[in-house]
């Protein structure tokens, strides 16, 4: 069997969004399950719009998702001499020709065709004319066959046939000599021995054109697979308001790479009713031919559900570094406070993203200087001073700082003062966290630590006394 070689070829003219990542994932999975190679290529011939920042973001996004590549990144901007060489080869073999048509003529031609309800296309005006000896500007067009059809078996869509009469003579070199997209892609796939081109279905109209150029070069054709687009929940093309943002924004919002990978593989592909896939299962089970031909709808709630699943199931050690980043972004000093792994284990059931987890965990690492106004009015009352004082004294005298012992102190104090457990736990929670939401109060006290907990209880008692005065 021929050695499988796939590629991902983004343009660095913007961010790497989830549609591009899904295409990269499918291509990467196909290579991995066939013991093949996954090649990364940066299509940066659009010098005006390509930026190094975009290149860096693409590489960083792929690394975050652990979509690793065997070769590259190759840069088209470094291969210009090779493209010119192939263009010259096509001209010499009479598979390409100079076109001197002015912009005005082409605009007039297009308007006439539209007026006559015809498909806008080049009419071949320069196709059979000899090259001029003047210094007039020209482009180079590929001499597309006028008979027959381009037929190929798409890995996802099955057999596709395009009549050559539907295709005009596309430009392969601009008037400044620069190669166009359809030429560079063909040369790269040929030179890099790509066996399977898996890409978005927005490229499907380019495929017959590229196949004809490959035929003219005497090159072996790769297999093609065109992945349907991702739509928003409203059925419209995915936009920023739906979630078509940089993949790194998902990282910054506290999503886990495992969750995003799992979500994207299920967008348009299924394996029975299975929802959760490990990376190993993805490689083993993914089937490119089983990808749906219909567009997939992006569901942010499903992604959140998956993210929470992974927060609960991934080892806290694995996500501790990302959690630390979120806490530091929130302005927290991590030198004081419990271990990150302990907080993750405690908060994973209660939060859906690492960012939310960090926002809800700040009180573990910084003193509480103020209270939510509504929470303080409801729970930090004069009637609770004595029970709080009792809790403070009992906690201070515990021989060891253990959750079970802490729990006993709260239960016994509530019974002593004829309070329901919640009537005592909520004021303690407000004193410790500044608000009414936290994990179980014994676990919260345990992680905050004895010294800090006692200080916070003292602060709350003073706060109540000041209010009484």
UniProtKB/Swiss-Prot annotation:
A motif ('KMSKS' region) lies at residues 237-241. It comes from the Bacteria. Keywords: Aminoacyl-tRNA synthetase, ATP-binding, Cytoplasm, Ligase, Metal-binding, Nucleotide-binding, Protein biosynthesis, Zinc. Gene3D superfamilies: 1.10.10.350, HUPs (3.40.50.620). GO terms for biological process: glutamyl-tRNA aminoacylation. Transmembrane segments: none annotated. Binds 1 zinc ion per subunit. It is found in: Cytoplasm. Its EC number is 6.1.1.17. ATP binds at residue 240. GO terms for cellular component: cytosol. Zn(2+) binds at residues 99, 101, 126, 128. The keyword Hydrolase does not apply. Monomer. Catalyzes the attachment of glutamate to tRNA(Glu) in a two-step reaction: glutamate is first activated by ATP to form Glu-AMP and then transferred to the acceptor end of tRNA(Glu). HAMAP family: Glu_tRNA_synth_type1 (MF_00022). Belongs to the class-I aminoacyl-tRNA synthetase family. Glutamate--tRNA ligase type 1 subfamily. This is Glutamate--tRNA ligase 1. The lineage of its organism: Bacteria, Pseudomonadati, Pseudomonadota, Gammaproteobacteria, Legionellales.
């Amino acid at each position: 069997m021929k050695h499988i070689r796939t590629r991902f070829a983004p343009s660095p003219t913007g961010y790497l969004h989830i549609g591009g990542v899904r295409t990269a994932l499918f291509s990467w999975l196909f290579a991995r399950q066939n013991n093949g190679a996954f090649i990364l290529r940066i299509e940066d011939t659009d010098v005006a719009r390509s930026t190094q920042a975009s290149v860096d973001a693409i590489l960083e996004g792929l690394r975050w998702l652990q979509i690793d590549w065997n070769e590259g990144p190759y840069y088209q901007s470094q291969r210009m001499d090779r493209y010119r060489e192939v263009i010259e080869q096509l001209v010499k073999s009479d598979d390409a020709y100079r076109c001197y048509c002015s912009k005005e003529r082409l605009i007039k031609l297009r308007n006439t065709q539209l007026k006559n309800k015809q498909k806008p296309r080049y009419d071949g005006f320069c196709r059979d004319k000899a090259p001029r000896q003047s210094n007039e500007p020209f482009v180079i067009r590929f001499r597309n066959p006028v008979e027959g059809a381009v037929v190929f078996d798409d890995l996802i869509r099955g057999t596709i046939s395009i009549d050559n009469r539907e295709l005009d003579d596309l430009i392969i070199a601009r008037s400044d000599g620069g190669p166009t997209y359809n030429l560079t892609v063909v040369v790269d796939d040929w030179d890099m021995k790509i066996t399977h081109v898996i890409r978005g279905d927005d490229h499907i109209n380019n495929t017959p054109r590229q196949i004809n150029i490959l035929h003219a070069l005497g090159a072996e054709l790769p297999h093609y697979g065109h992945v349907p687009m991702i739509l928003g929940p409203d059925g419209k093309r995915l936009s920023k308001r739906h979630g078509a943002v940089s993949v790194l924004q998902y990282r910054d919002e506290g999503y886990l790479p495992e969750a995003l990978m799992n979500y994207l593989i299920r967008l348009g592909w299924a394996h029975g009713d299975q929802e959760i896939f490990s990376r190993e299962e993805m490689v083993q089970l993914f089937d490119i031919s089983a990808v749906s031909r219909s567009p997939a709808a992006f569901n942010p709630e499903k992604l959140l559900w998956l993210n929470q699943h992974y927060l609960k199931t991934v080892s806290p050690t694995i996500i501790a570094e990302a959690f630390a980043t979120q806490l530091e972004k929130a302005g927290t000093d991590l030198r004081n406070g419990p271990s990150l792994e302990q907080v993750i284990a405690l908060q994973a059931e209660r939060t859906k993203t690492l960012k939310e987890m960090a926002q809800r965990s700040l009180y573990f690492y910084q003193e509480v200087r103020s209270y939510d106004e509504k929470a303080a009015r409801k729970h930090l009352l004069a009637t609770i001073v004595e029970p709080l004082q009792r809790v403070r004294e009992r906690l201070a005298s515990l021989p060891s700082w253990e959750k079970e012992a802490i729990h006993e102190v709260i239960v016994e104090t509530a019974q002593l003062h004829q309070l329901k457990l919640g009537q005592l736990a909520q004021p303690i929670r407000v004193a410790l966290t500044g608000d009414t939401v936290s994990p179980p109060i014994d676990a919260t006290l345990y992680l905050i630590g004895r010294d800090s907990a006692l200080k916070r209880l003292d602060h709350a008692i003073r706060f109540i006394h000041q209010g009484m005065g």
